[in-house]
Amino acid sequence: MTSNVAYLDESTAAGWERTLYAFLAEKQRRSDSLRTVQSYQRMLHDFFGRSGKTPDLVETQDVFAWAYGVGLSGRQPSSITIGARLACVSSFYRFLIRMKIISSNPCDPLERPKALPGAPRGLTGAQIKRLLDVVPGTPVGLRDRAIILTLVMTGRRRTEVISLKAGSLSIEDRVYYTYRGKGGKTGKRELPPPAVEAINSWLACSGRSLEVMAPDDSLWPNLKSGLAITSGTFYTNLRRYLKAAGLQSGGVHLFRHSAAKLRRDAGETVEEVSSFLDHSSLAVTSTYLRRLEGQEDRSWEKVAAAVGILAT
């Protein structure tokens, strides 16, 4: 590919680095997701580091070899990983084309593999109780218990809960929390009392309280550093709790599934669950719940009777 340099100087490695950071800055502004930007940054640095080429010299086979190649884990990439790699590199090249820096995208000839999503699952109320029963009464355990209850009671996503700060909570006639969700969507909702009580217990155990914490203080600080824990820290602990409770391993999103299913089981309508989850449409929620609950077969008895294996 030939380089059609616009206002950025790509004649040096430093110039290309500035272009990369310009792309990441735009990506963060558009997606409002630091996690997405960090993921793109890691993948792009890995790709260009392995290829040893500047963006204007990259060819389709370079992208293919990297996307389908073994990563740092030493394992063959899944279809989801391959798709994410291709999407990342392609997005960067679309940016370069829009900026009139290059004229073509080396990802265009490549087809993304079909990813078969795993069936979502949620924990039952009894399973969540089993899980909470194995969480220790230590300061870390009380913190993790508060996180679990906040996830289950609010149905918010992992990053939305982990990023909560003292200033995210407001005490009025009830306790409310503000959040920034997917796509930059913001909201203010009641924080159910079980989550409030768990948070207060955890903060009291660690010598903190909402009344004296600074607005920017994380609700989930590391006991040693005082800095906010990462979602990876919580996930590591969660895996241990699930194993101790005799439950199947799963990610943090398991609690969003659980929250949706428990609300539905409690009698909420699809419309109410959709609003609870901040879904973009009822169709999204209907599909979400159908995959969680399974679809009832109301005609199997008639079919069985027709073939003579069940008496009517």
Task: Label every PLM stretch briefly.
Residues 1-312:
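Conserved catalytic core of the tyrosine transesterase superfamily
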